[in-house]
């Protein structure tokens, strides 16, 4: 992404610089109270500002990113080992679903990443009509799976959106967060899906 934006706008951008700014960008996004698109804007503007983009050129960056997003969903990068971790969870008898603030393309993105078959249910906010942290979207996933809040566990990477939203629906939540990042007090956390599987699968690794 950095290389394509840089080439299109004549800016010197490196992926490493964007990665280094990701924790601060995530904190900026957490502070936004509003629609998910507003959180995304805060995240990207912080990310590119920290990577050295002058404030007067952020508008060009937003326009460029919007075009790239139409080509390929920018929020669907898959971490190494994701499928293996999901398969461990499923093999242990856990039923999996997705609740996503998105633009109607989550199902297609999961198929492109060869992950759709890992999930019984996918609830996309653009199709459902409400976004996290609204508890209604979490309840829709529960209803589709046929489980109660007490039988479910939600894992997400944003405290305000995922953890508080799940709790409002009566669901226990785990925050997916790098080990180096700070988390609010009293929040259960894991650093990766692999670590989650280690916690939830009886006997650990096979």
Task: List PLM regions with ranges.
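Asp-based, Mg2+/Mn2+-dependent phosphohydrolase catalytic module
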Residues: 7, 12-16, 49, 56-62, ...
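N-terminal helical cap/lid subdomain that shapes the substrate entry/recognition surface
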Residues: 1-84, 91-92
């Amino acid at each position: 992404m950095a290389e394509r934006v840089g080439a299109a706008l004549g800016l010197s951008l490196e992926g490493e610089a964007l990665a280094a700014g990701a924790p601060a960008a995530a904190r900026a996004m957490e502070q936004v109270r509003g629609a998910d698109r507003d959180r995304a804007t805060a995240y990207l503007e912080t990310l590119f500002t920290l990577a050295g983009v002058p404030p007067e050129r952020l508008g060009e960056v937003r326009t460029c990113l919007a075009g790239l997003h139409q080509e390929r969903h920018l929020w669907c990068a898959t971490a190494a080992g994701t499928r293996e971790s999901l398969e461990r969870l499923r093999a242990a008898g856990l039923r999996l679903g997705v609740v996503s603030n998105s633009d109607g393309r989550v199902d297609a993105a999961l198929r492109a990443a060869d992950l759709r078959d890992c999930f019984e249910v996918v609830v996309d906010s653009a199709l459902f009509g409400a976004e996290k942290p609204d508890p209604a979207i979490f309840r829709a996933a529960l209803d589709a799976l046929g489980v109660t809040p007490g039988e479910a566990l939600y894992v997400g990477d944003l405290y305000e959106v995922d953890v508080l939203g799940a709790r409002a629906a009566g669901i226990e939540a785990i925050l997916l967060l790098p080990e180096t990042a700070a988390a609010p007090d009293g929040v259960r956390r894991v650093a990766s899906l692999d670590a989650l599987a280690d916690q939830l699968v009886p006997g650990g690794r096979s």
